């Protein structure tokens, strides 16, 4: 998988559409969670895109410290359902963490869906609070 990092203004219309389509496919349709994915934060985020051939297969967005939380943060971690089981989730997160390290982001906050706790602890994240519900889905601050 090839990864690239782009600001919101660097995303061409077709690429932005692919990002929003993937996020909607997983976070709204697959997880049966009606919520507003377009939250007004994409403009401040940096977008980590993972491609196989010319198809977007994985994605995250990352915020510098102070743009979302006090620390930097990674969110909207998603892998296309048709491309799961190929370690793309780990690859996109490792690319996101490498970018954060290169930018000297010393602390990263995530809000992880609880069923993915092991995935995130294997990447070095630790629990930092109680479990909570976000849009009806159990989450864990890390």
State the predicted function of each range.
Residues 64-74, 84, 134-139:
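A conserved beta-turn-beta hairpin within the catalytic core of GNAT-like acetyltransferases
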Residues 49, 55-65, 71-78:
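Conserved beta-strand in the GNAT
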Residues 1-56:
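Short amphipathic alpha-helix that is part of the acyltransferase structural core
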Residues 38-43, 66, 133-134:
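A short beta-turn/loop motif at secondary-structure boundaries
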Residues 111, 121, 126-141:
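Conserved catalytic-core motifs of GNAT/GCN5-like acyltransferases
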